[in-house]
């Protein structure tokens, strides 16, 4: 593992690697996301950071998203769902972050303007996680404006059987998590089998345990590979299932009933892979992969409230809404890629991708209005069914040209052709014995776009790598944003088939330094984005079916309104010249939103957030003890971009972690984390659920 990678991964883990490991050359850390083939992290053309396997084993976090929270530029968001944490990158919402598993996209056509699919994978299957900041990988998809998270799974082992057993208890949720992974190789075959189960209770805060913050998830996965000469074949199967619900604060007792539940969110995938080393004069490698993926979701919502009405005939009106939605997304995709070594030190990767998402949604609902006097007593029941699909064809190419000593120029391009259509939309409502049928007209939307990225790197100084980069981002509206009518929390949001794609231009200057006991990775970035999709209040327009927002009913629709500018500075630094190793990681960000009626820099982003700490490794005859004391903190955040002002105070927590390795081959490990030692009451800027108070997490790991 590289020293640079260990610097970064150590910052996001509960402990770092041993001192002997931190001396390994950084050129041994291989990443694939920026070049679509194995290359060392040091020469990556973009800002990429790695969470390695040791970091994952040391972690006592209940959510894999929490393992990424200390990467500069990354923030956690929860949408009030404790079991479905997501990540933001450089101020961009999770819907603008591309999620990959072994380079294959996890699409989610139900995504809205501030939420995506989430991280539907368990760490037991993972070898590492690669995080690219900004849309700098045209090879995997510039469709992300914020960045890319690529989960790389284990592919086998160097002996017949080896594996990891892990168990963690977390007092913050009084919850347990258990996992096992076994991998190995037999002749030309290699394999991996993994599984996990997590049952987390309600979150414990300084004010007590929070209701409706419990959740469960489980996962299973299999990898089967075969190697024959220059040919490598692979088959992957994995499944992840989650059940969670929404936490909601109602201190004034405004609601008699309020719940948003996801009893089932399940991802199932089958993937095939083929690689061959051609070793021709120019053509060197060919890669092929394809997959089928299904995401199923059940969504249940109930809202009941009573409001006084200044009329003797009504006096008070009780409105009760219930919805139950089942949706299914079926994805098929295929990629073909070639790698060429051309004259004059050119390395060229070209390829083509095809992807199709098909979504079906079945919903049922009930809305009743009853007055205290009985003068109003109305109940409406509805049923609806939607079918829609989106197809994407893309061609991509990226060339690395070493045109002079120490100079490398990378240029990439990707061409998209997208087509979306609503193939069916039926609805029926029942009110007082009257039946009303509706049928939506078939609608379609299409687009084509070329996006580029380029990077210039210089490595002529000792232990220093400099880079300058530019990239374009592109996010096409989801099927939900284009065509579907969705209900949640008592509100209705309408799709808009006239939406345009979101676009961004991104600039970056970066430096990596590894010398004189220092490990530093830093970047200055700037981006301009336009045509952001947001939900607006309905005013009786056609897209809202003539509905208007009111105090008793909430109606919204999607439209392109926002422009955004973002400036930032990221840094990760560690010094290993003393017995105790100080380190720091952080992000400085300023973001501006602009609409036709508003221009503000109060966008809900904390100007500064990060982590600072001291690490120490004690090597003894029978055990190695790695300790880490650190402060995690963020400045205050103010948001007035939605017409109402919200403020989140700044916060800081003191934390301590220790990892103990023992056994003849250091095969046993005990991880202890003491979090929020001062029992601080706080909430992060993009999480709506209050953070846990003082808590302890203890884990046991057995490598065999």
Regions found by a protein language model. Name each.
Residues 402-409, 417-418, 517-521, 525-529, ...:
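Gram-negative outer-membrane beta-barrel transporters
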Residues 474, 525-531, 535, 632-640, ...:
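C-terminal beta-signal and adjacent terminal beta-strands/loops
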Residues 169-199, 209-247, 262-279, 283, ...:
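Transmembrane beta-barrel wall of Gram-negative outer-membrane proteins
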Residues 1-71, 183-184, 218, 270, ...:
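N-terminal Sec signal peptide and the immediately downstream disordered periplasmic leader
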Residues 167-173, 186-188, 197-201, 228-230, ...:
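Transmembrane beta-strands of outer-membrane beta-barrel pores
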Residues 252, 256-279, 384, 388-390, ...:
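Outer-membrane beta-barrel signature, preferentially recognizing the C-terminal barrel domain
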Residues 232-240, 265-432, 441, 449-459, ...:
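Face-selective signature of the C-terminal outer-membrane beta-barrel domain
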Residues 10, 23-159, 174, 509, ...:
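Acidic, small-polar-rich N-terminal luminal/periplasmic segments of exported/outer-membrane proteins
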């Amino acid at each position: 593992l590289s020293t640079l990678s260990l610097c970064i991964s150590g910052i996001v883990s509960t402990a770092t690697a041993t001192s002997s490991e931190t001396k390994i050359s950084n050129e041994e850390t291989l990443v694939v996301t920026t070049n679509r083939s194995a290359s060392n992290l040091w020469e990556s053309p973009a800002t990429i950071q790695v969470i390695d396997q040791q970091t994952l084993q040391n972690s006592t976090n209940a959510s894999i998203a929490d393992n990424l929270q200390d990467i500069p530029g990354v923030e956690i968001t929860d949408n009030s769902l404790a079991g479905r944490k997501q990540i933001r990158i450089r101020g961009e919402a999770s819907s603008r972050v591309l999620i990959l598993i072994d380079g294959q996209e996890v699409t989610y056509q139900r995504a809205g303007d501030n939420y995506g699919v989430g991280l539907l994978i368990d760490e037991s299957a993972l070898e590492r996680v690669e995080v690219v900041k900004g849309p700098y990988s045209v090879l995997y998809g510039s469709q992300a404006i914020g960045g890319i998270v690529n989960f790389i799974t284990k592919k086998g082992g160097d002996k017949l059987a080896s594996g990891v057993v892990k168990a963690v208890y977390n007092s913050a949720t009084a919850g347990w998590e258990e996992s096992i992974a076994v991998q190995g190789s037999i002749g030309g075959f290699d394999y991996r089998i993994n599984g996990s189960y997590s049952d987390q209770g309600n979150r414990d805060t300084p004010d007590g345990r929070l209701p409706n913050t419990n959740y469960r998830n489980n996962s299973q996965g299999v990898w089967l590979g075969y190697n024959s000469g220059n040919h490598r074949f692979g088959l992957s199967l994995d499944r992840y299932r989650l059940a969670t619900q929404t936490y909601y604060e109602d201190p004034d007792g405004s609601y008699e009933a309020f719940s948003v539940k996801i009893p089932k969110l399940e991802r199932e995938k089958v993937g095939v892979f083929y690689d061959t080393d051609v070793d021709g004069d120019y053509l060197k490698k060919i890669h092929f992969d394809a997959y089928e993926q299904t995401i199923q979701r059940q969504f249940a919502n109930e809202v009941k409230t009573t409001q006084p009405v200044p009329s003797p005939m009504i006096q008070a009106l009780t409105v009760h809404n219930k919805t139950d939605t089942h949706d299914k997304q079926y994805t098929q995709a295929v990629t073909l890629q070639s790698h060429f070594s051309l004259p004059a030190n050119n390395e060229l990767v070209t390829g083509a991708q095809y992807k199709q998402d098909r979504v079906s949604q079945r919903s049922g609902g009930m809305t009743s209005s009853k007055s205290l006097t009985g003068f109003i007593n109305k109940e409406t029941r509805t049923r609806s069914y939607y079918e829609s699909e989106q197809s994407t064809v893309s061609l991509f190419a990226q060339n690395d040209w070493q045109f002079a000593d120490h100079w490398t120029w990378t240029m990439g391009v990707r061409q998209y052709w997208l087509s979306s259509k609503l193939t069916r939309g039926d609805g029926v409502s029942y009110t007082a014995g009257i039946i009303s049928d509706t049928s939506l007209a078939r609608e379609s939307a299409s687009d084509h776009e070329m996006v580029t990225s380029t990077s210039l790197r210089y490595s002529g100084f000792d232990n220093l790598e400099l880079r300058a980069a530019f990239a374009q981002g592109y996010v096409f509206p989801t099927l939900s944003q284009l065509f579907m009518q969705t209900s949640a929390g008592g509100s209705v949001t309408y799709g808009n088939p006239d939406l345009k794609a979101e676009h961004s231009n991104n600039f970056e200057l970066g430096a990596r330094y590894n010398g004189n006991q220092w490990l530093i990775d830093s970047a200055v970035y700037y981006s301009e984005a336009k045509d952001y999709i947001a939900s607006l209040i309905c005013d009786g327009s056609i897209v809202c079916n003539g509905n208007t927002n009111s105090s008793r009913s909430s109606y919204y629709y999607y439209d392109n309104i926002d422009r955004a500018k973002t400036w930032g500075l990221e840094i990760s630094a560690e010094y290993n010249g003393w017995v105790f190793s100080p380190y720091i990681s952080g992000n400085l960000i300023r973001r501006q939103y602009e609409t036709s009626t508003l221009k503000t820099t109060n966008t809900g982003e904390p100007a500064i957030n990060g982590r600072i700490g001291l690490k120490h490794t004690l090597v003894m005859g029978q055990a190695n003890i790695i300790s880490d004391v650190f402060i995690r903190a963020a400045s205050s955040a103010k948001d007035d971009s939605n017409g109402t002002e919200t403020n989140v105070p700044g916060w800081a927590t003191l934390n301590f972690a220790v990892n103990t390795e023992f056994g003849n081959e250091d095969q046993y490990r005990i991880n202890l984390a003491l979090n929020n030692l001062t029992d601080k009451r706080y909430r992060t800027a993009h999480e709506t659920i209050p953070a846990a108070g003082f808590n302890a997490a203890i884990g046991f790991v057995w490598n065999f």
